[in-house]
Amino acid sequence: MIIKPRIRGFICTTTHPVGCEANVLEQINFTKAKGKIANGPKKVLVVGSSSGYGLSSRITAAFGSDAATLGVFFEKPSTETKPGTAGWYNSAAFDKFAKAEGLYSKSINCDAFSHEAKQKAIELIKQDLGQVDMVVYSLASPVRKMPDSGELIRSSLKPIGETYTATAVDTNKDLIIEASVEPATEQEIADTVTVMGGEDWELWMQALSEAGVLSDNCKTVAYSYIGTELTWPIYWHGALGKAKMDLDRAAHALNTKLSVTGGSANVAVLKSVVTQASSAIPVMPLYIAMVFKKMRAEGLHEGCIEQISRMFNERLFKADGTAADVDESNRLRLDDWELREEIQQHCRDMWPQVTTENLAELTDYREYKEEFLKLFGFGVEGIDYEADVNPHVEFDVVSI
């Protein structure tokens, strides 16, 4: 079929398999050009490995450290009338390129919150790898099906305490608007912590530990974002922030356990990037368009793969073997460049000035839109989008 982009709300409902493969290859080539990670991991489990930071983590481990990787995700293959999800094609491309280099690659397509996902991962690790020396937890899901009761819990992207009103961009109409978001109820806050907090990360690590599939020096990392006062009302001081604070709680608990055998658990605070997850958060697209323009001008711009490469090389697996630099809460900070005062001051100055008319001039909004489409395999250089492509892509994946 010939596949064109179709946008609905915060997602593109179509995907291009060849474009997705090209995106993955671009990240692989970046990783290879960086050279090998000195003390990198060799057997890695990535929970949430099909897009964004999770995919970049899998690529960095495999192509930067020759690691065997097991990826867990929840994606949809193609049907007779519809292409598969971008994460399906990303994972298929990763599998193809990893196997071509003789690297172990297996994937599990399932609900990562379920007991079954954990048991299947343990089974494959025991069967193929013995143990893993790194676990990356990178789930971004709006819903969690509770593994025991089957109850569906939903997260909320809302402020706490009072209605939040701010200048934002309507990404469908390319208009500057005033966005208002009602505050979360106590129940919505609790539910957001249940879905996006640290509990499931702990359950994964507990299951892996009890099964004896964690090596003595196993490192685990989960991803977070803090930002600044520009986004705090909707993010760090909102319901989502409470969940991310719970991730910190989980990291401390896990670190206490893992450090006994020379392992570690950290939250890595990353910069804002264009992902399917961030595009759904009110105000984030406008902030990202602003901050990207300034960071590009300063030569500090990074996407997912650059961030994760820096985390592996300069934080977790330093060439000199020394411990990672952490903040006062034991977090790895990769948002350091974004948080530089001159970058943030630029955004503070720009925010009141942005209008629909000057949006493209004052910010990198055009580039934001291009990057958003690229997530789904569109607008990638060198791809013929008029060509007939086969949407049915199979690979080494166990579906539960």
Swiss-Prot record:
Substrate binds at residue 225. Pathway: Lipid metabolism; fatty acid biosynthesis. Its EC number is 1.3.1.9. It comes from the Bacteria. It is an enzyme of class 1 (oxidoreductase). The keyword Oxidoreductase applies. It catalyses: a 2,3-saturated acyl-[ACP] + NAD(+) = a (2E)-enoyl-[ACP] + NADH + H(+). The active site is at 235 (proton donor). NAD(+) binds at residues 48-53, 74-75, 111-112, 139-140, 244, 273-275. Keywords: Fatty acid biosynthesis, Fatty acid metabolism, Lipid biosynthesis, Lipid metabolism, NAD, Oxidoreductase. One of its GO terms (biological process) is fatty acid biosynthetic process. GO terms for molecular function: enoyl-[acyl-carrier-protein] reductase (NADH) activity; NAD binding; trans-2-enoyl-CoA reductase (NADH) activity. The record marks 75 as: Plays an important role in discriminating NADH against NADPH. Involved in the final reduction of the elongation cycle of fatty acid synthesis (FAS II). Catalyzes the reduction of a carbon-carbon double bond in an enoyl moiety that is covalently linked to an acyl carrier protein (ACP). Belongs to the TER reductase family. Monomer. This is Enoyl-[acyl-carrier-protein] reductase [NADH]. It comes from Shewanella pealeana (strain ATCC 700345 / ANG-SQ1).
